[in-house]
From Swiss-Prot:
Pfam families recorded: Flu_M1 (PF00598), Flu_M1_C (PF08289)
Organism ancestry: Viruses, Riboviria, Orthornavirae, Negarnaviricota, Polyploviricotina
Region described as RNP-binding: spans on this chain: 165-252
Family statement: Belongs to the influenza viruses Matrix protein M1 family.
Major subcellular location class: virion
Record has Membrane as a keyword: yes
GO process annotations (BP): viral budding from plasma membrane
Miscellaneous information on this protein: Most abundant protein in virion. When expressed alone can form virus-like particles in transfected cells.
A GO term from the CC aspect: virion membrane
Region (Membrane-binding): 1-164
InterPro entries: Flu_matrix_M1, Flu_matrix_M1_C, Flu_matrix_M1_N, Flu_matrix_M1_N_sub1, Flu_matrix_M1_N_sub2, INFV_M1
This protein's encoding gene: M
Name of the molecule in the record: Matrix protein 1
Keyword tags: Host nucleus, Membrane, RNA-binding, Viral matrix protein, Virion
Record note on quaternary structure: Homodimer and homomultimer. Interacts with NEP. Binds ribonucleocapsid by both interacting with genomic RNA and NP protein. May interact with HA and NA. Cannot bind NP without genomic RNA.
Length: 252
């Protein structure tokens, strides 16, 4: 799984199901594909979204700022700064500084995520705030590791509050990952289709997958329901890849 796919999976796992989730998923895909380069307009759009908690908006704003190239002097947004101040708790700030020093030494995504997971959500948010406010710099990979650790903690607490049985992998994250991978695979199919004889069929399968993912995000479904989506898609993809003679990305 690529780094950006992983980031998209974790970020989307903390957003409540509904039309807005499908819209945010599309924005993230566009940003990661380099199709949306207007950071100012993106932040203005994010600021006015309903439903999202201030912290979720702060995390999304942080991810957009990390990813979209912008002019150096571009103003930092107050709604992101307020969300990433660790509730104004000095303890959170102290821990955030300690974490930041550790993240400076981590250059990999997984290393940073591992280190960050041992801190509280408040400390993690404060640490993002430090980086967002240009008070410190870490590698983009380390910053994304910090983002995913924060999302994992939020998703864990949401999952516990759903009173579902905890498994080794968080079902909300696993569910979102299946949907992100379905979208990614659909995109890959469209690109590969080209002018081959099976192009129309490939586009049809990809389109069905995309519509299904969008519907599931809009309506909201039980975390286990995406397993069916995965199985249906796999059947279609395996039939398609036999004819194309290629190996498609497998689902987890």
């Amino acid at each position: 799984m690529s780094l950006l796919t992983e980031v998209e999976t974790y970020v989307l796992s903390i957003i409540p199901s509904g039309p807005l989730k499908a819209e945010i998923a599309q924005r993230l895909e566009d940003v990661f594909a380099g199709k949306n380069t207007d950071l100012e307009a993106l932040m203005e759009w994010l600021k006015t979204r309903p439903i999202l908690s201030p912290l979720t908006k702060g995390i999304l704003g942080f991810v957009f700022t990390l990813t979209v190239p912008s002019e150096r002097g571009l103003q930092r947004r107050r709604f992101v700064q307020n969300a990433l101040n660790g509730n104004g708790d000095p303890n959170n700030m102290d821990r955030a500084v300690k974490l930041y020093k550790k993240l400076k030494r981590e250059i990999t995504f997984h290393g940073a995520k591992e280190v960050a997971l041992s801190y509280s959500t408040g400390a993690l948010a404060s640490c993002m705030g430090l980086i967002y406010n240009r008070m410190g710099t870490v590698t983009t990979e380390a910053a994304f590791g910090l983002v995913c650790a924060t999302c994992e903690q939020i998703a864990d607490s949401q999952h516990r509050s759903h009173r579902q049985m905890t498994t080794t992998t968080n079902p909300l994250i696993r569910h979102e990952n299946r949907m992100v991978l379905a979208s990614t695979t659909a995109k890959a199919m469209e690109q590969m289709a080209g002018s081959s004889e099976q192009a129309a069929e490939a586009m049809e399968v990809a389109n069905q997958a995309r519509q299904m993912v969008q519907a599931m995000r809009t309506i909201g479904t039980h975390p286990n329901s995406s397993a069916g989506l995965r199985d249906n898609l796999l059947e279609n993809l395996q039939a398609y890849q036999k004819r194309m003679g290629v190996q498609m990305q497998r689902f987890k």
